[in-house]
Amino acid sequence: MSENVISSSKNVVSKLLYVKDEYWPSVAPAATELISKLINAFWCQTLNGQLVEEDEGERNCIFLFDRCLKTEGCLKKIGPVTVMQFLACFLLSSQNHAYAWSVCRQIPSDDMAFKFTKCFQNSQQFRDANFCKLVLVWTVCQCVSSTVYYPAILDLLPVLSDLVKEMEKDPASLQAKENEFWLKKLIQTSLHHSSDNSLVFYLEMLLDSLDLRNCIYVVFEDEALFRRLKDIGNPEIRMMLDSGLRDWRKQRSGRSSSHVASKGINKVVNINPGDVKSLIELFPQLSVEEAVEHLSASLGNIDAACESVITSSLPEELDSSTHSPIYTKPNVDSMHKQPKKAIAPLSLSSSVTAVISNRTSDKKTRSTVAEEDDITHLNISPDRLYLNKKPEDLNFWKKSVPETDKSRVLNLLAMAEDDEYDDTYDDLDTTGPVDSGVGDDDPEASSKDAHDFQKFINQTLYDFYQQNPEVFDQKARKSKERADLLAKLDNSLTHEQIEGWRRMFTTDSKFAEAVKKEVTFGSGNTNIGSLRQTKFKQSNYTPPELNDGSRQHRPSRPSKNPSLKKKKYVRTKPKKASNEK
């Protein structure tokens, strides 16, 4: 059907390209409908691996699609599926990818935003493997603009969860396996494009949600995603990964029991599914088939099976390569009964990868800045190695300065000499209150002088304020009354200080009360006493009874009673007896 559409529309497409601009608006709706059907036919041939590259036919189709996009009103009739099919068919072509790329860059993505959002929200479309392939190519290429519209991962995960449940009920369903495979690839590709914070959020959601817990294998089966999560280095994320790995192993062990029973491997040897589960928990790198084969070779003895895994002594007749794993890439060619051919939308050519410079589809590892340096390859000469601080070059100050540095220094010196003195603020009155106590030897006298000066200022300002409060307004700066006030204060305050005093006097009740009390009663600052603090001085007065020199010493304590003194005993030699000579 698609071959008939393409062959019959070749002449029509070439004629539509030569239609004059004045007649084009009447022909544009029919041309838009024709190009949509033609692109759909190209996509069907691409899926079946029967697309025959014809440079002239493809080029005419690209030019006609470009002309329809530039026509007002035709863009509304072109849907997101047609745009994605155009991308998948012609951007992967080895001959016309440059023309297709130029057309895709001109698509107004802002006008297509609502259509793409509405299309991706239809979750039933993602149960079709062909639609998942189409969106997968769209996600990898990102050709329209920097603002690319992706299907929401939150909408794709429930569909994948339902497909996994269907596969558990009917493991022999090849259609469900194919849909699950391509939908899983689409979700993994979207996760690759997401940020680190988004990736952690999806991991938490998969672990916390009971309905989506069976989709956790999407993260752990992709080595790049798993390594990316481990590289984040957060201890909480590592704990989440450990918890997710335990859940994933439980899922694998749960599937193993049903898989062993369905394949009938335990007919020869009675194998307990619990032993298979225990062996997989001990050795997570084993698949279900390998665990069953080790148990079969060990006659169901789990200890002997563990020993065979450690020593890798599996018999040749029980090689695991003869069995197929549970979740593998479905054989699409056998389902459609077609010869084995590479499906075009699944691989990007080198020319397309060169055009799409922002994303690389074959990037397996995350490279760093210092990955291919000399230190990594150990290509450092011994002359560059040193201990502690780098040794100083003794001939550094003997070297001549480059001419560029000399000219730059001379220019800076010339600019510094040519700069004139700035006398803008020389004529301004910079007088202000001066603390007369600074540098005085007597701090008490300086404090009293400052207090008297402040009292004089408060009294003067208070008197002027009682006579005419308008003198303190900002508008009265050039008035005669303000000039008299400044003369009275001997220009010790500025206009701003005078106006600020009035603002404090009217708003701060404590300050106003203190000023009134000081002016009225002259009490001044309560922190400073009315009398100066005197220092203690040694008196020269001597009592007359001490002048005659008859002063006697008065003991500090009474003398001891002589009768209470201890007796001193003197040790005497004993007298000799009379019979001793």
Curated annotation (Swiss-Prot):
Q: Which InterPro entries match?
A: CUE
Supply the CDD domains for this chain. CUE_Cue1p_like
Write out the annotated subcellular location: Cytoplasm; Nucleus
UniProt biased composition (Polar residues): 522-542
Question: What is a biological process (GO) this protein takes part in?
Answer: rescue of stalled ribosome
Q: Which GO terms describe its cellular component?
A: cytosol; nucleus; RQC-trigger complex
Using the UniProt annotation, give all residue ranges assigned to the region (Disordered). Answer: 422-448, 522-581
UniProt main location, coarse: cytoplasm
A molecular function (GO) term: ubiquitin binding
* Occurrences of domain CUE (ranges): 271-314
Biased composition annotated in UniProt, kind: Basic residues:
552-581
Q: What is known of its domains?
A: The CUE domain specifically binds RPS20/uS10 ubiquitinated by HEL2.
Its assembly, as annotated, is: Component of the RQT (ribosome quality control trigger) complex.
| Biological role | Involved in activation of the ribosome quality control (RQC) pathway, a pathway that degrades nascent peptide chains during problematic translation. Specifically recognizes and binds RPS20/uS10 ubiquitinated by HEL2, promoting recruitment of the RQT (ribosome quality control trigger) complex on stalled ribosomes, followed by disassembly of stalled ribosomes.
Q: What is this protein called?
A: CUE domain-containing protein 3
Source organism (scientific name) = Schizosaccharomyces pombe (strain 972 / ATCC 24843)
The root-end lineage is: Eukaryota, Fungi, Dikarya, Ascomycota, Taphrinomycotina
